[in-house]
Each structure stands twice: as structure tokens, then as C-alpha cells.
Amino acid sequence: MKNERELLMLFYDSDNFREVLRQPFLNDGKVCATDGHILIRIDSSLCEGSYDEKPGGLTPPRTASVVPTATTDITVTRQQIERALEQAPEERNRQCPECKGSGDVTWEYRDRHYNTHMMEETCPVCDGSGTVDDYTVIKYQFIVCGKALGYHAVKTLLAAMSWLYIDTIRLVNADAQPMLFKPENMDVEILLMPQIKDEKLDTVKVI
């Protein structure tokens, strides 16, 4: 597997509040990368790079403890995932979420006599412009075998399949948390943590 770091980068966050999860690590013979919600495990024999069991002297969690036993075998196709994502496009919004585009925010202060004072000031987030850099508005959850997955998890699964040049992936445990996906004839495991179903979000069925 050449340049597997590109694949691993899909699964971890270099700004993660847990320092030990800011880079890939070696764990029980598996090269692992996780942000705490999604996880990939690749047999080290498939990887070109070298990885530490204690990156930066820190001890990562034992990922084997969260890998569920295979209990089913459901094929998920790239086409199914792509179709679901097309039904739930990312929405971009430049309006400042703090001031709602007005450029001003109102704050209050209660003095020692319990009098409340209101003051309108320039919004500190957008500096009064009313706009911010584009951010994603999440309005959807994706249903896989009755479980809800977030947009980022589903998009990462599709990106990993594209990187691995595979059109199908096996869902081998849909009941556990996390859910376990495995490519055919490849010692790779992808685990996605389901979300609590949010009644305020629209749902899109994958399978």
C-alpha cells in the first residue's frame, strides 16, 4: 500500500484535543488512525511507512477493544453512498452565526445593585462585517441498517473506498457501536460510531 498516510489522514485530526490522536500509531500490529468517532485499522504489513506504538511518548488506546465480532455480511456500494450524499448536499452559509449578519451583538451586565445594563457592540466574531468564512450547515443524518451516521462519517467512508479503489465494502456488524466495515480480501477495518437520532434533522437512507 503506497502513500497510505493519505488514507490515514481521512480519519484523524491534527488539532484533536487528545494529543495522542493527532497522528497515526501502531497498535497490536495494526496501523491505526482515529478522531475518536471514526477509526481505521490497517495491517502493518500492508503499509510502507513506519509508525510508533507510543507516538510522542504517549500511550494510545487499544483499538482492538472496540472492534466488534462479525455477525452479518451486508454489501454496501459506492453508488448507494453517492446517491445518499447527493440527496443531502452540504449547505454553505457566510452569515455570521453570532450576530445573524447584523454586525452587532448585545450584551448585558448586572451591577452590584442588581440593575441590568444593556450595551450594543461590534460583533467580535466577524468584526462587524456580518459575514464569516464559509462553514457547513448540517441538516441530515444517514440511516444505515436502522442506525444514524453523521455526514462526516459517511463522506469519510466514501473517500476511503475511493482511495482503496473499491466499489463495494462489507458491513460485518451493524448492531454494535461502532459499526464495522471491511473491504473484501483486504486486511483493513473501518469503524464508524453511530449518532443518537436527532428528530430535528432530516434523514436519508443509505441501505
Task: Cite the ranges covered by each PLM segment.
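C-terminal functional regions that serve as terminal interaction/effector modules
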Residues: 28, 34-38, 42-207
